[in-house]
Regions:
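Glycine/threonine-rich flexible loop motifs
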Residues: 28-35
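Membrane-embedded hairpin module used as a gating/binding unit in multi-pass transport
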Residues: 1, 15-28
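Single-pass alpha-helical transmembrane signal-anchor segments in small membrane proteins across taxa
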Residues: 7-15
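C-terminal non-catalytic interaction/assembly regions of soluble proteins
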Residues: 35-160
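Membrane-interfacial loop-to-transmembrane-helix junctions in polytopic alpha-helical membrane proteins
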Residues: 2-6
Length: 160
């Protein structure tokens, strides 16, 4: 059955590391266009300067042609944010949303996409969730605050 579940997660503090998944398989993690929904929720849980570890298989790559065009042709992540302010375009809005997240946090992507391609769209490729988590813990230290959001697309963190 196709159930739509939305959870609110009340946080006492914002995390330095958010481990977020687009679990549930396709279509939730079919491509980055779909997986971005989990990223958009996770941004509310991470402190400025933190890292979001985004887990989504993305076997179809990026997804939308417009989304792809915005990502691959952007000279910088911030340029997508500037562009959406001047020229709203469906598909481009999701690329700009990624650009906005990147202004506050690093994004490590665990996916099936080619690592060089992932780097070219301003994300840090990781081979596994364990590799990404270990790298983040090394960067921030063992006392880092961590939040796990396995169903990121259906979880909205609220910081109190």
């Amino acid at each position: 059955p196709n159930m739509r579940l939305t959870m609110s997660l009340v946080l006492g503090v914002m995390a330095v590391i958010a481990l977020v998944g687009a679990l549930g398989g396709a279509p939730k993690d079919a491509n980055l266009y779909q997986t971005q929904k989990a990223l958009d929720n996770a941004k509310h849980a991470v402190k400025k300067g933190g890292t979001i570890i985004l887990i989504g298989a993305c076997p179809e790559g990026l997804g939308s042609k417009t989304f792809e065009s915005w990502l691959v042709n952007a000279p910088t992540a911030h340029s997508m944010v500037e562009r959406i302010g001047k020229q709203f375009q469906l598909g481009g809005h999701k690329a700009a949303a990624i650009g906005m997240v990147l202004e506050n946090a690093a994004i490590d992507l665990v996916s099936e996409m080619d690592p060089d391609f992932v780097r070219s769209i301003f994300l840090n490729p990781r081979a596994s969730a364990q590799e990404a988590f270990s790298a983040a813990m090394e960067k921030y230290g063992q006392d880092a605050t961590v939040i796990a959001m396995p169903f990121g697309g259906a979880t909205l963190p609220i910081c109190k």
